[in-house]
């Protein structure tokens, strides 16, 4: 059974493993950086714990971590945040886990944090992700052409957003 919990120090080795996995990092933007290490990720975690602008979660099947997600750049003034999701364990990709956890984090952002807008960026050629985000109500707000170079070619980045729809009473 899948569950979502706050990111813990014991999750850092999984983060290192997944961020160094080409099949995960090619869609997170991490590929353009150098390989990460346990030390770097422990430093990242220490900084993360001091921040009010981030909420980071681990996706688990029982007690086994299978991915991570969160909201960053949370602006209390502008009531918006940047969403990210990575399914690190290959056995859980393409099985609806992304949709399930995206639904949870969107609800968390709009109802717990009272955000007005949740945004994300995605490579235009990541068709499964683009289609998932559109099906969840995200709309394309813009496109940056030839934004990132990896895999021997340039990739466009789409900026997408979903707005909270408050019911009128």
Residue ranges and their predicted role:
Residues 94-108, 130-135:
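Conserved acetyl-CoA-binding loop-helix of GNAT-fold acetyltransferases
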Residues 133, 138, 160:
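Conserved active-site tyrosine of GNAT-family acetyltransferases
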Residues 119-122, 139-156:
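Conserved catalytic-core motifs of GNAT/GCN5-like acyltransferases
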Residues 64-67, 128, 154:
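Glycine-rich acetyl-CoA-binding "A-motif" of GNAT/NAT acetyltransferases
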Residues 1-42, 168-169:
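A short, well-structured alpha-helix characteristic of acyl/acetyltransferase catalytic modules
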Residues 111-121:
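Conserved GNAT acetyl-CoA-binding A-motif
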Residues 36-92, 163-166:
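Acetyl-CoA-dependent GNAT
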Residues 98, 102, 125-129, 146-151:
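Short glycine/proline-centered loop/turn elements that form peptide/ligand docking sites
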């Amino acid at each position: 059974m899948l569950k979502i919990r706050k990111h813990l120090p014991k999750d850092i080795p999984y983060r290192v493993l997944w961020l160094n996995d080409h099949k995960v990092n090619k869609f997170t933007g991490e590929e353009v950086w150098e390989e990460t290490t346990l030390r770097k990720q422990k430093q990242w975690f220490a900084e993360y714990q001091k921040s009010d602008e981030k909420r980071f979660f681990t996706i688990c099947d029982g007690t086994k971590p299978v991915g991570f997600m969160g909201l960053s750049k949370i602006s209390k003034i502008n009531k918006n945040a940047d969403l990210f999701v990575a399914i690190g364990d290959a056995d859980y990709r393409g099985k609806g886990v992304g949709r399930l956890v995206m639904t949870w984090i969107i609800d968390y952002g709009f109802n717990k944090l009272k955000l007005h807008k949740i945004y994300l960026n995605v490579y235009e050629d990541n068709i499964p992700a683009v289609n998932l985000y559109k099906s969840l109500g995200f709309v394309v707000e813009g496109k940056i052409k030839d934004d990132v170079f990896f895999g021997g070619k340039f990739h466009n980045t789409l900026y997408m957003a979903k707005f909270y729809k408050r019911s009128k009473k």
